[in-house]
Swiss-Prot record:
It comes from Solanum lycopersicum. May play a role during germination or early tube growth. Expressed in anthers and pollen. PROSITE patterns: OLEEI. Residues 1-17 form the signal peptide. The gene is LAT52. Pfam families: Pollen_Ole_e_1 (PF01190). This is Anther-specific protein LAT52.
Amino acid sequence: MAKAIVLLSALCILALANFAHCRPEVFDVEGKVYCDTCRVQFETKLSENLEGATVKLQCRNISTEAETFSVEGVTDKDGKYKLTVNGDHENDICEVTVVKSPREDCKESVSGYEKARIECSDNVGIHNAVRFANPLFFMKAESVQGCKEALDELGLFPLEF
């Protein structure tokens, strides 16, 4: 009888431990938005962080394409944003999109580069509640002075500046 009580107690404790380990699925998505001053579609030493840029995270069901989650945010003085995603979105495609630039001189977006895809599920092999999105950007209408030199330092040779 004593063995049965010990066994039952151990099972109850394990069940409670498993319950205590449960946590709501909440993810933080962090990223950055910058102004591409050289119009090369990647960051250079002349790129400028964009404070006040609006970004939107949107999750859509893979099969139906119905929106399952959406949240907007604004970048800080360093061009960084942090968005909170509630729930597991294993069956969704989640993307962060640049929505609006705070600067009139740097507001051009490039089709195909205005989004960063992220995984918002515990079931993808990532054991961290923070997800990092690729940097997003807006471009100036014209390249600024010094771009040729900045690209030369990187070993890149621009075709036209």
